[in-house]
From Swiss-Prot:
Domain EGF-like, first and last residues per copy: 86-122, 125-165
List of residues that carry 4-carboxyglutamate: 46-47, 54, 56, 59-60, 65-66, 69, 72, 75
Top-level class of the enzyme under EC nomenclature: hydrolase
EC number: 3.4.21.6
Active site (catalytic residues): 280 (charge relay system), 325 (charge relay system), 422 (charge relay system)
Protein name: Coagulation factor X
Gene source species: Tropidechis carinatus (Australian rough-scaled snake)
Length: 483
């Protein structure tokens, strides 16, 4: 009996093992439904499958061409690839003031909203001197990431840090129209004296009375042959078809007169001591005196006659070409300022080049001839003339236009400076302040079609002027009497 019981137990154990195996192992057909292995690339039809960015570039390293096949869009490919290669440069949000960042390989690009600029859109446009002069009324200078405004001499910088208001009754560049506007009292300011141009030799001046016969200009060609007089640029240039300048509207105008009492050149009042004029005016007479405040030389009611102490002619003046055509006249006694006698403001070089000379028009005035070969004018004339771009200027002229010159005038409209106006002011107004920008120098005739007036470019000589003007400060002596 015992052997039979043992046999039954063994058979029962073997049956239970077979049942367990059938529960663990599936038939191959069933098992393959669950245990299929995904194949990668190199299959027969792999290249015919649509691109998949995960299959192409996430599971394995891919090329840009493979990424393009997956996206089938160049812009999406570029966006993906820039991040894929070296990470997202825009993750730190580098663009300020709402700028939009676009990632690149090793770099990024910010697209700024209106009113901002810079690599990271970090600059507000009004904080750039290149845009509307930084909103400064006079001079603008970049300081780190901001701008600093300053004002011309005798002006005060406003509490807003931008505006400039006259600090006295007769501040420079204020004619009667500007003075009629409301003014305010503002805190002190600092003027920028950082310009760096030609140096001045302190001993380089001509005292009056002097015989100027040694300065008679000769115009020569490259082979040293004397040109005909009719081929010369006209040195006594230059206001045709202008209007009368009313009392107080051109208060910086000066008139140079000879020993016969005749006016022959103009000038611009810069300070109580100094008048700016053209170098070529100095060789035209033995004696020079200066009249200021006059608008009608036939009536002689408003002007003052001044004696000259010294004359500084630029040491590089070239009589044959009128290059460096600039001189400063020093008065023996200070000019007394009034509503009719006010200096023009002296700009900084940057302000003149980047702001003033990019205005549409300048203002020219003088007592010169009202037409070519006509009589000189008894009344002060003024005309508004457009700036002419340098390329057009050079093409129009038969004579050299150097870096120290610029052109102004109309191509066809008969308005111009003319003979007798030489040395006079070319003024540019900016925010109701008038700055000296040029000296009437020369031209080919007066108001001729296709010809423009040539002017000495004052911005090239700012430091030269300032250094001379520092040689002598105004004294307390009174000016000479009326005409």
């Amino acid at each position: 009996m015992a052997p039979q019981l043992l046999l039954c137990l063994i058979l029962t154990f073997l049956w239970s093992l077979s049942e367990a195996e059938s529960n663990v192992f599936l038939k191959s057909k069933v098992a393959n439904r669950f245990l299929q292995r995904t194949k990668r690339a190199n299959s027969l039809f792999e290249e015919f499958k649509a691109g998949n960015i995960e299959r192409e570039c996430i599971e394995e390293r891919c090329s840009k061409e493979e990424a393009r096949e997956a996206f089938e869009d160049n812009e999406k490919t570029e966006t993906f690839w820039n991040v894929y290669v070296d990470g997202d440069q825009c993750s730190s949000n580098p663009c300020h003031y709402g700028g939009t960042c676009k990632d690149g390989i090793g770099s990024y690009t910010c697209t700024c909203l209106a009113g901002y600029e810079g690599k990271n859109c970090q600059y507000v446009l009004y904080q750039s001197c290149r845009v509307d002069n930084g909103n400064c009324w006079h001079f603008c200078k970049p300081v780190q990431n901001e701008i600093q405004c300053s004002c011309a001499e005798s002006y005060l910088l406003g509490d807003d840090g931008y505006s400039c208001v006259a600090g006295g009754d007769f501040s420079c560049g204020r004619n009667i129209k500007a003075r009629n506007k409301r003014e305010a009292s503002l805190p002190d300011f600092q003027t920028d004296f950082s310009d760096d141009y030609d140096a001045i030799d302190e001993n380089n001046f001509v005292e009056t009375p002097t015989n100027f016969s040694g300065l008679v200009p000769t115009v020569q060609s490259q082979n040293a042959t004397l040109l005909k007089k009719s081929d010369n640029p006209s040195p006594d240039i230059r206001v045709v078809n202008g209007t009368d300048c009313k009392l107080g509207e051109c208060p910086w105008q000066a008139l140079l007169i000879n020993d016969q009492g005749d006016g022959f050149c103009g000038g611009t009042i810069l300070s109580p001591i100094y008048v700016l004029t053209a170098a070529h005016c100095i060789n035209q007479t033995k004696y020079i005196r200066v009249v200021v405040g006059e608008i009608d030389i036939s009536r002689k009611k408003t002007g003052r006659l001044l004696s000259v102490d010294k004359i500084y002619v630029h040491q590089k003046f070239v009589p044959s070409t009128y290059d460096y055509d600039i001189a400063l006249i020093q008065m023996k006694t200070p000019i007394q300022f009034s509503e009719n006698v006010v200096p023009a403001c002296l700009p900084t070089a940057d302000f003149a080049n980047q702001v003033l000379m990019k205005q549409d028009f300048g203002i020219v005035s003088g007592f010169g001839r009202t037409r070519e070969r006509g009589q000189t004018s008894n009344t002060l004339k003024v005309v508004t003339l457009p700036y002419v771009d340098r390329h057009t200027c050079m093409l129009s002229s038969n004579f050299p236009i150097t870096q120290n010159m610029f052109c102004a005038g109309y191509n066809t409209l008969p308005q111009d400076a003319c003979q007798g106006d030489s040395g006079g002011p070319h003024i540019t107004a900016y925010r109701d302040t008038h700055f000296i920008t040029g000296i009437i120098s020369w031209g080919e005739g007066c108001a001729q079609t296709g010809k423009y007036g040539a002017y000495t470019k004052v911005s090239r000589f700012i430091l030269w002027i300032k250094r001379i003007m520092r040689l002598k400060l105004p004294s307390t002596e009174s000016s000479t009497g009326r005409l």
